[in-house]
Structures are given as C-alpha cells and as structure tokens.
Amino acid sequence: MAIASGSASPVEYDDAIVRLFFIATVTWALVGMLVGVFIALELAWWPANMGIAQLTFGRLRPLHTNAVIFAFCGNICFTGIYYSMQRLLKVRMWNDTLSRLHFWGWQLIIVSAALTLPLGLTQTHEYAELIWPIDWAITLVWVIFAINFFGTIATRRVDHLYVAIWFYMSFVITIAVLHIVNNIQIPATLTRSYQIGRAHV
C-alpha cells in the first residue's frame, strides 16, 4: 500500500485493487490470445474443432473478441484508473467495498460470457453478443464503478482536476451510454430477448 507524501496527512492508497485488476488483465490476456490462436488454427485446418459444436469458429470467435474487449481491455483500463486516480486526487478510492464488488462482479461477467458464448447463447449482434442477464449485470457493475469513481472525485484532496480525470469521466459516461443504447432489448426468456430498434432480415 503506497502512502502519499507532501500532503497534510498521509494517504494510504488502495493498491490491492490495482494488483487484482492487473493480475486479471494478464490472466485474461493469455486466455484471449490462446482462444485467438486456436480459432486461427481452425481457419487453416478446420478439423481442429474435432466436430464439437462448442469449439467451432462461429462459437469461439465471439468469445475471443469479448475476451479481448471486456476481459483484457476492460481490466487494464480499470487497473490504470484505480492506480492513477488515487494519486492524481491524493485520496484513497471512496469505498473499498465498492472497489471489490466492481472487481469480482466484472470477473463474474467475464466467466459468464466464457460459459454462454460457446453454448451459442448470444444476441447475434456483433460486439454485443452477450445475453440480456449478462448485459444487465454489466450495467449494474458499471453503476457500482461509477458511484465509487465519482465519490472519489467528490472527496479529493486537491482543488483542480487533471485533464486525465476529465478523460476518465468521459470514459465512464460514454461507455455507459454506448452499452445501454447498443443493448436495448425486451427479455423473452432467461437466455433470449428481442432487440429494439434493429431491423431483422
């Protein structure tokens, strides 16, 4: 746990959450790359799937892209934000419990995607394949992250905000809007839903 110096009283930064997100980043990067190598092998030699539906290119490609987007990129973004934000604002993250809920919730989302995508449970919309319960979980975990994020800004120990913090704010808001608008749907069953605002051919 790093301690800030040069302030009225020392600040113990929550580096444990940074470490967790970093370990998750490396782990999921390896998983995503291994899936990518396997589906590349399938393109060159299709019998690699051994006739198992869950190992076919069509099932594993969404798993690969989602692993790279949500697991690798998502975790590394959170690693950077949790590390730099505390230091730029000279304050510990607003709520340690919310930080842990954010971390474990995000990893549960990734595991859920890794289980459902190979089973063919998708919305069939590229880069928004995840079924509605997982989409709703993403929204919930993002709200937890946003509350902790803006709570930290509200309790900062510096008067000004660095440009990086403004970029982080736009990241939090933009991704929330993008996710919600891109995944508007009416649930039909536990694993099926109807998309709103998309033409079906």
Where are these regions (language model features)?
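Extramembrane terminal tails and long inter-domain/linker segments of multi-pass membrane proteins
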Residues: 1-22, 47-54, 195
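Hydrophobic cores of alpha-helical transmembrane segments in multi-pass integral membrane proteins
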Residues: 19-121, 132-153, 165-190, 200
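Inter-helical turn/loop segments and adjacent helix faces that build the functional surface
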Residues: 152-160
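Transmembrane helix-loop boundary segments of multi-pass membrane transporters
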Residues: 127-131
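Residue-level detector of conserved catalytic or cofactor/ligand-binding positions
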Residues: 195-201
